[in-house]
Amino acid sequence: MLEKESDLTAMEKPNNKHAADSFSSEDLVSPVKKAKKSEEVSGGGEAVAAVGNREAEEDKPSFVSEEKKEFLVEADVAEDKGARHTMEDVWVVLPDASLDFPGTLRCAHFAIYDGHGGRLAAEFAKKHLHLNVLSAGLPRELLDVKVAKKAILEGFRKTDELLLQKSVSGGWQDGATAVCVWILDQKVFVANIGDAKAVLARSSTTNELGNHTEAGNPLKAIVLTREHKAIYPQERSRIQKSGGVISSNGRLQGRLEVSRAFGDRHFKKFGVSATPDIHAFELTERENFMILGCDGLWEVFGPSDAVGFVQKLLKEGLHVSTVSRRLVKEAVKERRCKDNCTAIVIVFKRV
């Protein structure tokens, strides 16, 4: 995403000793009981909490609508630095973000932050975005879609504002793209900036019992995010109005490929934005699973290809942790992904 990355990393001091070549949260944590505070598994750096997302069955996050339909959400993550010398992706798997707010809507949060020119911006966003979204008024009692979207927009704005202040004082120059998911009750919100992507696997029909009918049939892959690159007309227009130049290589000022990101303070004056696109949908029996991935994953997997790969493994009865690991392994070892590669697989089950 950023050419001449070495020019931008001279003043940063990332701690990469925790970034293994290949990683899943299953490798790090064991089953835990429900914590008194929000349980988080976060990766790509020194702040790795020793709690997991495989709780006892009665403690797993589920979401109940007014019709009392209940969905179990299982998720896990895997990462690999690929051919890169350092790992600049970080991630969050927060299966129950509502434990700090008793009596509120059940909430889950998942995110991938893909750093470029370093990992400081990605780490900052991981630590602050979710809290800023909550502080901005993410609904906790009665779901209001407009209010939720407004809170997400404000959370992104506030996070980037604070990051830019920090980057000036700390001499940071790096940036990070993001793909984030919040699940409130049965409503799913997906927000992204840059080229990280979320793909939904949906069945074409359900039978009269409400069960999936995709057995033997491919699921439909639905891309829930929109890529933000400087070469795309809508993004190019904003950049040019801000005085930015798209070079012949398709990059802003000849260097930055993405047009929306956290950080990148030297490019903000040229129209780089941290305003996300937000997509919302309702969980029904047709939604099977989601795949969140950084651009490294999608460079070697098409959306339908990735959905088919995951569907096959899930039909074999493999746990979501194994599925996420195999997806990343396939991308890096078999398909020769050269970039950092991180994927979160989120499975929806009706119980």
UniProtKB/Swiss-Prot annotation:
- Note whether Disulfide bond occurs among the keywords: no
Q: Which UniProt keywords apply?
A: Hydrolase, Magnesium, Manganese, Metal-binding, Protein phosphatase
Residue ranges of domain PPM-type phosphatase in the record: 74-348
One protein family per Pfam: PP2C
Q: Where does Mn(2+) 2 bind?
A: 114, 295, 339
The entry marks the following residues as binding Mn(2+) 1, namely 114-115
The enzyme class is: hydrolase
| Enzyme Commission (EC) number | 3.1.3.16
PROSITE patterns, per the entry: PPM_2
Origin superkingdom? Eukaryota
Its UniProt entry gives the catalysed reaction(s) as: O-phospho-L-seryl-[protein] + H2O = L-seryl-[protein] + phosphate; O-phospho-L-threonyl-[protein] + H2O = L-threonyl-[protein] + phosphate
InterPro entries, alphabetized = PP2C, PPM-type-like_dom_sf, PPM-type_phosphatase-like_dom
Q: Gene3D superfamilies, alphabetically?
A: PPM-type phosphatase domain
Which CDD domains did the record assign? PP2Cc (cd00143)
Cofactor binding remark: Binds 2 magnesium or manganese ions per subunit.
Task: Indicate, by first and last residue, each region the UniProt record lists as having compositional bias (Basic and acidic residues).
Answer: 54-63
An example molecular function term from Gene Ontology annotations: metal ion binding
User: Could you say which cofactors this protein requires?
Assistant: Mg(2+); Mn(2+)
Region span, Disordered: 1-63
Family, as annotated: Belongs to the PP2C family.
Protein name from the UniProt record: Probable protein phosphatase 2C 8
Q: Which organism is it from?
A: Arabidopsis thaliana (Mouse-ear cress)
